Regions:
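FAD-site-proximal beta/loop scaffold in flavoenzymes
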Residues: 127-155, 249, 261-332
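Beta1-alpha1 glycine-rich phosphate/pyrophosphate-binding loop at the start
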Residues: 2-78, 82-83, 166, 173-217, ...
């Protein structure tokens, strides 16, 4: 089947790295419809810099239409996919305003990414936001700087100490990077700006169920990271599991089973991810299997078994325990796009997807980062420069790269974080509705008939939230307070 121009129809769900690289690989060999519920592509590895005031959202995100304006074969659609008609080869999505529209396809690529996982406790999200979207980063920015403002006007010493205590759940790259940035905000950026408080007295608590931060980087770099965090003043609580999150406090169980309450003004969740609800919808429609995190199990060519026309890419796919990093998304997108292009040109033979590990990098603080590339392990100042180069190279758009360089120069040489504007009304802003579990209360009713090239379809039902993974290292699958366990309050 083809569209009116005679080209093969390809629908891509998701405008992240996987979706964009698939678009670029297809070139002009197909008519492409790219569907995303946001109208921008965001560089997620730098979201923590947006949340701590270094970067503006415009420097780490770019409009999809602008990025793809030279790709005349690509139509960008802002809508949220809600269902798949596999037999009829249709994608059903909800447009702005609530009406459903459909898109026919010959090949379907689903690269919808992942969302924050609370391991069976979505109620934690209200008091412990994750960081997967621009909305998340801006909400965290308001919470962080708002905490210092609230502490400045607090008259009760205990209340002031609570506002100046920050907890991070999860000591992977995002948790470590955020922890380091929060201490730099307190000890450098804000140090001379307040008269009633000492921002440098702010406590940053880092919790993880594992034995060390950045464990995935290996023992050597993990120890270097732990040492750098110690020097920054980050209080590391390894072997600790957060069992409850509420307004103003968290409950933590250590490796001995003792539970401790910590009074905290801000809790940030960086402990894990899971596939979005649309993965369950796709699995139900195709009969595909899902792993513990809800990701779709795919064949070696990244397609769903018995459905060679449907590819699942990036963080949403499950194959050979590949990590959820940008390089996997990029390479899988390039592979899937080339595979479809080869099929269009009549090339039948195809090779299985092979991931080339380009290494990992994590920023800790100014002049300190860890980088692991195969047998090469670098830390400290050299690692920091390598980190800068990698992230500049991966940023989308020349303007964003140049802007990032100037922003980093000001931030790193003059302790300036210009992106700190917010109002009192914004301090308590809750997280974006898309980051919360989908359900009847978040669904939008259809309001008006759709117009234009996309036909309206009857209302469809989104799938249930995928089952939470069990036995995660940072947070238990069922973190309930154990009866009879000793409980204490942190000093």
């Amino acid at each position: 089947m083809t569209d009116q121009s005679g080209q093969r129809r390809v629908v891509i769900v998701g405008g992240g790295f996987a979706g964009l690289f698939a678009v670029r690989a297809l070139r002009r060999s197909a008519s492409v419809t790219l569907i995303d519920r946001a109208q921008h592509h965001v560089f997620q590895p730098l979201l923590y810099q947006c949340s701590t005031g270094i970067m503006s959202e415009g420097k780490i995100a770019a409009p999809l239409r602008d990025l793809l304006k030279k790709h005349k074969n690509v139509d960008c659609v802002m809508a949220e996919v809600s269902d798949f008609d596999v037999e009829g080869r249709r994608v059903i999505a909800r447009r702005i305003g609530g009406k459903l529209i459909e898109f026919g396809y010959d090949d379907l690529i689903v690269a919808a990414g992942v969302r924050q996982s609370y391991f069976g406790h979505p109620e934690f999200a209200r008091w412990a936001p994750g960081m997967k979207t621009i909305s998340d980063a801006l909400s965290i920015r308001r919470r962080v700087y708002g905490a210092f403002e609230m502490a400045d006007t607090a008259t009760d010493p205990e209340e002031r100490r609570t506002y100046l205590t920050f907890a991070l759940v999860g000591a992977g790259p995002t948790g470590v990077e955020l922890a380091g940035q929060l201490r730099e905000v307190a000890t450098k950026t804000l140090r001379a700006e307040f008269r009633n408080i000492k921002p440098e007295d702010a406590r940053v608590l880092l919790f993880d169920g594992g034995s060390a931060p950045l464990a995935m980087f290996g023992p050597k770099l993990s120890q270097k990271a732990a040492s750098a965090l110690d020097k920054l003043g980050v209080e590391q609580h390894m072997g600790s599991i957060v069992t409850h999150v509420d307004e103003g406090w968290i409950l933590v169980r250590d490796h001995d089973g003792a539970e401790t309450r910590y009074d905290v003004g801000t809790t940030l969740w960086t402990a894990g991810v899971e596939a979005p609800p649309i993965a369950k919808v796709l699995a139900t429609a195709t009969g595909a299997q899902q792993d513990r995190a809800g990701r779709i199990l795919v064949e070696k060519n990244l397609t769903i078994p018995d459905h060679p026309e449907i590819s699942v890419l990036g963080d949403m796919m499950s194959l050979d325990e590949l990590p959820g990093v940008a390089e996997v998304a990029m390479q899988s997108g390039l592979y899937a796009g080339q595979r479809i292009r080869h099929r269009v040109s009549g090339k039948i033979e195809e090779k299985p997807f092979r991931y080339r590990d380009l290494g990992s990098a994590a920023y800790i603080s100014r002049g300190k980062a860890v980088v692991s590339v195969g047998p090469l392990q670098v830390n400290g100042f050299l690692g920091w420069w390598i980190w800068l180069f990698i992230h500049i190279a991966f940023l989308t758009g020349v303007r964003n790269r140049i802007g990032a360089l100037f922003t980093w120069w000001f931030a790193f040489t003059r302790d300036i974080r210009r992106e700190r504007t917010f109002t009192t009304q914004q301090i308590e802003t809750l997280r974006d509705v898309y980051t919360l579990p989908l359900g009847p209360d978040t669904a939008t009713a259809a309001l008006e008939p759709a117009t234009g090239r996309h036909a309206a379809t009857p209302e469809t039902e989104t799938g249930a939230t995928p089952a939470a993974p069990q036995g995660h290292a940072n947070v238990p699958s069922d973190p309930v307070q154990a009866a009879g366990k000793p409980q204490k309050t942190a000093e």
